[in-house]
Amino acid sequence: RSFNISALQSLFNEDVVNVVVPVTATVFKTLTDSTPITLLAAPGAGKALDIQQIILFVDAGSVAFNPSQDPDLAGPTTFTAIPKGSTVCASTTDVLYKVGLSASPVGILVQNAALTLTANAGTTTTGNGMLYFNITYKTVNTSSTMV
């Protein structure tokens, strides 16, 4: 019996990728629903992103962010909003927050969909910190063999 490299990597979860995506205060304050921030690019035709974990680090500045709505993660499946409360985005102290993925561990993965951050019809006008999204994911082929 023979195996290809991608099948072996998948078998032992060696195809899981971890990236850190920084979002500056300037970029975060320009966030709208019509101009989302791309955290992970769409993987291409015949592929889907399987988001396994997202941890948000808010490196707070001297002025807290003030999102008027909870920013949303959107893309490969339906995710939960990121709370804007005093413990996450609107904090003047550093915060490490594990985003609860509403589609995890089950959900329909959408083919060729990017992972984006949207404003959820809100605006952010103040803040001078940084956001860092630590994203753990794998790219899954959507063919019948899934490799």
Regions found by a protein language model. Name each.
Residues 1-147:
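Surface-exposed, low-hydrophobicity beta-strand/loop segments enriched in small/polar/acidic residues
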